[in-house]
Amino acid sequence: MRGVVRKAGKLKNRLPVNEQWLAKFDLLRTLVRRDLEARYKGSVLGNLWPLLNQLSQLLIYTYLFSMLLKVKLSLKGLPENNFTYGLWLFAGLLPWIAFTGGLTQATNSVVGQTNLVKKVVFPLALLPLVPILSMFVESSFGLMVLIFFVAITSHTLHATLSLLPLVWITQLLLTAGLGYLAAGLTVFLRDIPQTLGVILNIWFYLTPLVYPAKVIPEQFRNWIFWLNPMTAIGEIYRDLILVGEVKHWGEWGVATTVSALIFCCGFLVYKRLRPAFADVL
């Protein structure tokens, strides 16, 4: 921890702006790496645990919706069976798992690091980003497994996979914006984490991740897409990984715009509240 604080202290030196940003990026990378190492330190399976957790959720939802509720779907180039439904389901769940995990942990990122908050030299803007990026890295293991099984099943790798970094930007903007907002408010309102848990449970079932969007009545479907960025993000993941073509350009554009606005608002609230963190904690 002393090494992290010393590295943060360098950011206060009279460095050119570009060097300050590089120093912050290097510090953020160090914090994310340490966070990932600390999560499963001492466990036998280590970093395989995130993948096992993701696969367990996949099996549960596949069994519930595909076998019990008999939800069926057909995708171009893939057989119409329960395994294809599992791939479709996993493609939608991956961004959701990264989103909710990162947001939930970011909520307590400030109140859980009082020693860093009270260090004058530490850039507090990095704290909510650490768990968000850690969850994003963890979800990448599941993403690689998904792409592997899609390639085996469809005998092809879609060129649209190259567009995944663009949808990651949308996803990170949304998660970071809400993470900044929740982290800042939690310092003053300790009920925020519990409230957020309830909101995320409702949000999950309002988002067509475990069921196709076509089952939503048409008069409500557009509202679900326009007002809920996670709907568009989940559909774009499926477009890029499973289908090989982007069918939701408009929804993607709206989701990116909304996510950027949420990021700006969340960061501004966090920045406004930041001077009082040390006094409250």
Feature annotation, model-predicted:
Residues M1-L281:
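Hydrophobic transmembrane alpha-helices and immediately adjacent juxtamembrane helices
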